[in-house]
Amino acid sequence: MEDYILKVEELNYNYSDGTHALKGINMNIKRGEVTAILGGNGVGKSTLFQNFNGILKPSSGRILFDNKPIDYSRKGIMKLRESIGIVFQDPDNQLFSASVYQDVSFGAVNMKLSEDEIRKRVDNALKRTSIEHLKNKPTHCLSFGQKKRVAIAGVLVMEPKVLILDEPTAGLDPMGVSEIMKLLVEMQKELGITIIIATHDIDIVPLYCDNVFVMKEGRVILQGNPKEVFAEKEVIRKVNLRLPRIGHLMEILKEKDGFVFDELDLTIGQARKTINSWKNKIFND
């Protein structure tokens, strides 16, 4: 039996101006895995995330966290936000304290933990995100990538079960993208945290994500593992997305250059293995 940490049932959300942002969303998020939410701008990804941790309340339908409907009382929402943390796309919207230590400790202080526990959690969060050396640095002196790590540490300090990140790789150079994604996967594997990301960086999805949901106009139109989702090439392109670059290359080799592949590979490692297998078969024949 599958273990789902979040279950979304017929979720609808309407903004006060009448915008119907989410339309009958049904979604199950597996515990302890990395899930990607894909879709163009304005499809409802951020609205969905804000429903996940109680910033917004569904117009209809419901969300279950740990198999229990979300409790929208003040106490229930405070508890929920300790368990489901959000890291926004722009860390400047999340950092507001004078120093890194003050900012990272904010959530733990609000939980009314003891000073010793706060210090312990902050030190652990700083170590986990590899920013111990920035502990006393003013937040306004940080690079964009450093600010991203501080924002993640500020959520980690509350020891959440779910970490939601809106465009975690936006604004980062290639090395920064690789480092931040490896950090997230490390936390998922070592701490058992469920990671949910919204991203336009298609190439990271087959490398780091276990499950994928594709949204269009407030609805989920595709779901599955990366190979299952990107196999639906026409649907992917109709919603203004694309295949991962390696997947596109393998598609071209098959359709235009006579290569014979059983399935669409999406990563360099997968493609190398398939091409070597094809090459060996040709030479042996």
Swiss-Prot record:
Gene Ontology process terms (BP): cobalt ion transport
Record domain ABC transporter: where: 6-242
A Pfam short name: ABC_tran
Keywords of the record: ATP-binding, Cell membrane, Membrane, Nucleotide-binding, Translocase, Transport
Record has Coiled coil as a keyword: no
Domain of life: Bacteria
UniProt key word Translocase: yes
Topology in membrane: Peripheral membrane protein
A GO cellular component annotation in the UniProt record: ATP-binding cassette (ABC) transporter complex
An example molecular function term from Gene Ontology annotations: ATP binding
E.C. designation(s): 7.-.-.-
Principal cellular location given in the protein's record: membrane
PROSITE patterns (alphabetical): ABC_TRANSPORTER_1, ABC_TRANSPORTER_2
Function noted in UniProt: Probably part of an ABC transporter complex. Responsible for energy coupling to the transport system.
Descriptive protein name: Putative ABC transporter ATP-binding protein CPE0195
